[in-house]
């Protein structure tokens, strides 16, 4: 039976959704299928099922992770259903995407604890009450060996080795465990089990997303559309944002820390951060980009707005205002902040500067404390410490500063 043509209002709605959903994406595979799925959704009133798979091996969410979350929120706001797939089963293997060596497996307890952290932090962007939460152990644990052989028969070793990370490891003689080949197969099978219409991931996940599309066809399902999002560069402006590279902004960090880190984003990346990591409209983003280009907007002011926007998104309006004022006080006027945490000192005096920094939790280890002093990153009452062997006389009101944003005031 031939489908009825869309009404002018329905056609307008399809175009509206496509304009929003194409924002910031790298690739839609295939793009015409996305249009067809949205047309069907608008015609029938049935929401699309949009999947995001999570490997709960590193649960602290940073701005880089939020790129896909903002896209999911757009789908939610358009009335579609978000499928949050916790890879508790696949997490025991660990996603080998982009890895140069075999990853250690996680215990069930680690996977579950990390999954809880994900859900809590994702709720800062997504409406978790409107998202459906799934654990892939529900169906993957139920597969018998015959099912696994059937699944494995859908893919060749040659095709697996087309994956960039596997290819590099194979050519360099690095071992690849057979179980790692099952990760993309299992992730693809998740789409079969969930009957997903769309799956979203970073560009490093493209192979896995297309695996879902291929397996859905093999199992007689409608094929999902794969949408890839950019991997945002970190604060160094070169490598992708990563906690291990210490070039990240964590969404759970303190407001002043988020704001201060935003001020260190390279100028050339500001517009990308605005587009991919904030909730500002494209008209607002375009206006900022135009202002930066024609010189009517100073890069410092654009960064301050970006920092305030990020703090507002994850902490609130009041905290954003306070972070702006804190930054102006500490860095623009070169004064000390008014709310320096006070620590009652009952220890020895004098005390070795390295021990002092670790005791005050300003640095996590003596090694890092030594390096920070040697690099000129430690001040006492505004004076730079140059001697790593310095014995510090503890006096009431002594202000210890590490880097640009960490302060402690000692009271006796």
Swiss-Prot record:
Q: Which reaction does it catalyse?
A: tRNA(Tyr) + L-tyrosine + ATP = L-tyrosyl-tRNA(Tyr) + AMP + diphosphate + H(+)
Entry keywords, A to Z: Aminoacyl-tRNA synthetase, ATP-binding, Cytoplasm, Ligase, Nucleotide-binding, Protein biosynthesis, RNA-binding
- Gene Ontology terms: biological process: tyrosyl-tRNA aminoacylation
Q: Spell out the molecular function terms from Gene Ontology.
A: ATP binding; RNA binding; tyrosine-tRNA ligase activity
Where does the UniProt annotation locate this protein? Cytoplasm
The family database entries (SMART domains) matched by this protein are listed as:
S4
The intrachain disulfides are: none
Binding, ATP: 243
The sequence motif named 'HIGH' region is recorded at: 56-65
Q: Which CDD domains match?
A: S4 (cd00165), TyrRS_core (cd00805)
- The UniProt entry annotates the motif 'KMSKS' region at 240-244
Q: Which Gene3D superfamilies match?
A: HUPs (3.40.50.620), RNA-binding S4 domain (3.10.290.10), Tyrosyl-Transfer RNA Synthetase (1.10.240.10)
Q: Which domain of life is it from?
A: Bacteria
Matches recorded under InterPro entries: aa-tRNA-synth_I_CS, aa-tRNA-synth_Ic, Rossmann-like_a/b/a_fold, S4_RNA-bd, S4_RNA-bd_sf, SYY-like_C, Tyr-tRNA-ligase, Tyr-tRNA-ligase_bac-type
Which PROSITE patterns does the UniProt entry name for this protein?
Answer: AA_TRNA_LIGASE_I, S4
User: EC number(s) on record?
Assistant: 6.1.1.1
- Give the primary localization class: cytoplasm
Membership in a protein family: Belongs to the class-I aminoacyl-tRNA synthetase family. TyrS type 2 subfamily.
**Its biological purpose:** Catalyzes the attachment of tyrosine to tRNA(Tyr) in a two-step reaction: tyrosine is first activated by ATP to form Tyr-AMP and then transferred to the acceptor end of tRNA(Tyr).
How is this protein named in the record? Tyrosine--tRNA ligase
Q: Which organism is it from?
A: Halalkalibacterium halodurans (strain ATCC BAA-125 / DSM 18197 / FERM 7344 / JCM 9153 / C-125)
This chain is encoded by the gene named tyrS
């Amino acid at each position: 039976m031939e489908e009825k043509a869309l009404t002018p209002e329905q056609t307008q709605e399809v175009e509206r959704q496509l304009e929003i959903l194409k924002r910031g994406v790298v690739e839609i595979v295939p793009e015409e299928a996305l249009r067809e799925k949205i047309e069907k959704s608008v015609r029938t009133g049935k929401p699309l099922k949009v999947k995001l798979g999570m490997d709960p091996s590193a649960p602290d969410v940073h701005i880089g992770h939020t790129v896909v979350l903002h896209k999911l929120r757009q789908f939610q706001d358009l009335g579609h259903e978000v499928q949050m797939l916790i890879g508790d089963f696949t997490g025991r293997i660990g996603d080998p995407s982009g890895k140069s060596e075999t990853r250690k497996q996680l215990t069930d307890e680690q996977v579950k604890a990390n999954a809880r952290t994900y859900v809590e932090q994702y709720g800062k962007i997504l409406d978790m009450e409107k998202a459906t939460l799934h654990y892939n152990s529900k169906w993957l644990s139920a597969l018998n060996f015959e099912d696994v052989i059937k699944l494995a028969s859908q893919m060749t070793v040659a095709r697996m080795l087309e994956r960039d990370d596997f290819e590099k490891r194979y050519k360099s003689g690095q071992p690849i465990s057979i179980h790692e080949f099952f990760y993309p197969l299992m992730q693809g099978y998740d789409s079969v089990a969930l009957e997903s219409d769309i799956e979203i991931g970073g560009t490093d996940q493209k192979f896995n997303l297309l695996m879902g599309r291929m397996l859905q066809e093999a199992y007689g399902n409608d094929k999902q559309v794969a949408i890839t999002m950019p991997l945002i560069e970190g604060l160094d402006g070169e490598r992708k944002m990563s906690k291990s590279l210490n070039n990240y902004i964590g969404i759970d960090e303190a407001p002043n820390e988020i704001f201060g880190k935003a001020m260190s984003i390279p100028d050339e990346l500001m517009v990308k951060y605005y587009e991919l990591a904030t909730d500002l409209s494209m008209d607002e983003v375009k206006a900022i980009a135009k202002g930066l280009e024609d010189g009517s907007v100073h890069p410092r002011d654009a960064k301050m707005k970006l920092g305030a926007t990020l703090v507002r998104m994850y902490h609130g309006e009041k905290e954003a205002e306070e972070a702006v004022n804190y930054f102006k006080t500490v860095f623009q006027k070169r004064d000390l902040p008014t709310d320096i945490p006070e620590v009652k000192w009952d220890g020895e005096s004098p005390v070795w500067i390295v021990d002092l920094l670790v005791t005050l939790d300003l640095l996590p280890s003596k090694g890092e404390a030594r390096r920070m002093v040697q690099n000129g990153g430690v001040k006492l009452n505004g004076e730079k410490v140059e001697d790593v062997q310095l014995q510090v006389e503890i006096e009431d009101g002594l202000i210890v500063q590490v880097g640009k944003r960490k302060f402690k005031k000692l009271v006796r």
